[in-house]
């Protein structure tokens, strides 16, 4: 496997945190030593251990001299968790491959700079577009301090949103409905018109889908 393939695996891991990490980003990490994956992890919930620490903790052998693949630049500041760069240095990681640079002003290149200052080989921007897209909501908020808003509108081919009796349940297909549920799981709030509340109040949540 090459750098892109390992990063793609890290992306798959990161997506497991979808809906649980906000306002933090989704992050995945993979530890590779001598061509073998010896550890992997992701940021599972806001306030809990970050992906890098989870990946290092899961290692089946000493990670010293290994390569760490991570979808987002490792943090270098104290928050609810200690800096990930400290864990990387303590583990003796030889090389770090990063997908996205972290736009958070508390990081913003500082994490990578610290790693390089300690002699770690850092490769940047591997699958950057995919890694950036994964956290577009986080990137938007951290750089603008404004909420990321997504609008959903469903209507029939002739422009209707319901039958005149109000008896209609769905006008969208199963694929569209599942997509909406996945989107709801990603967002922290749902805004509707007042007329929707008495009709659909109990349904204004993310329902389970098979995807």
Task: List the model feature ranges, each with a label.
Residues 100, 194-195:
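Short secondary-structure boundary segments
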Residues 31-130:
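Zn2+-dependent cytidine deaminase-like catalytic core
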Residues 10, 28, 75, 115, ...:
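Residue-level signal for inorganic ion chemistry
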Residues 23-26, 148-149:
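Short, small/polar residue-rich loop motifs at catalytic or cofactor-binding pockets
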Residues 4-20:
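Short, basic/aromatic recognition patches
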Residues 137-192:
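Phosphate/diphosphate-binding glycine-rich loops and adjacent basic-rich segments that engage nucleotide
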Residues 202-209:
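Conserved small/polar residues in nucleotide/adenosyl-binding loops
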Residues 27-32, 153:
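Short beta-strand scaffold segments in enzyme catalytic cores
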